């Protein structure tokens, strides 16, 4: 606890505090019939049962508080998860630091040809990487210089800040229960999520494992590395087991085959 885990070029995640562990989950689940903690194996089986069957309230008994430093564009995706409590540094009260996210060269890629909100997997050539990085840094320096000039003229901080870029780093305290944290992690560790927020989610999951290893193991088995099948897809599986054609066609068949091949939700 209190250790900073580096994320991106200047960001971090730090576990400030937590309430409850795996033991709290099993104790709250068993309270209805008065039985306390049993063996680790029995506790693991109970936690696995609860997660598989979506009995969520015992997981809500465990609460984490994180201190996070992250670029504003990542924060704006993060804040879509409204089942948490947070306090963020204010640009109205504080002078924001000249700290901006600059992607590593290997992460600079062209727009995806088949995904309107994503990038291609391959990095652009080295010369273009250098050009993009130089351009980003120059723009960031120029904008921050303008911000500083406005502050020097005693312009209100709440106005001086408005041109600062989405790459500016912000900080917040973020508190969330384990059930809703698992929902956040399931979405933000997924391959469809933007790489930068995925980096934060993966570090957060590693921290979570140190507090609730049994719950995280079940989450990894059923949610992170599992997929859901529709009624039609289940029927297709039955057909394949029986040696028949799947019965699916077109996009439905493509999605079904991709699920089986990749082991992830599509």
UniProtKB/Swiss-Prot annotation:
It comes from Treponema denticola (strain ATCC 35405 / DSM 14222 / CIP 103919 / JCM 8153 / KCTC 15104). Homotetramer. DUMP binds at residues 77-80, 88-92, 161, 188. CDD domains: ThyX. This is Flavin-dependent thymidylate synthase. Binds 4 FAD per tetramer. Each FAD binding site is formed by three monomers. Gene3D superfamilies: 3.30.1360.170. PROSITE patterns: THYX (PS51331). Its EC number is 2.1.1.148. It comes from the Bacteria. NCBIfam families: thyX (TIGR02170). Belongs to the thymidylate synthase ThyX family. A motif (ThyX motif) lies at residues 80-90. GO terms for biological process: dTMP biosynthetic process; dTTP biosynthetic process; methylation.
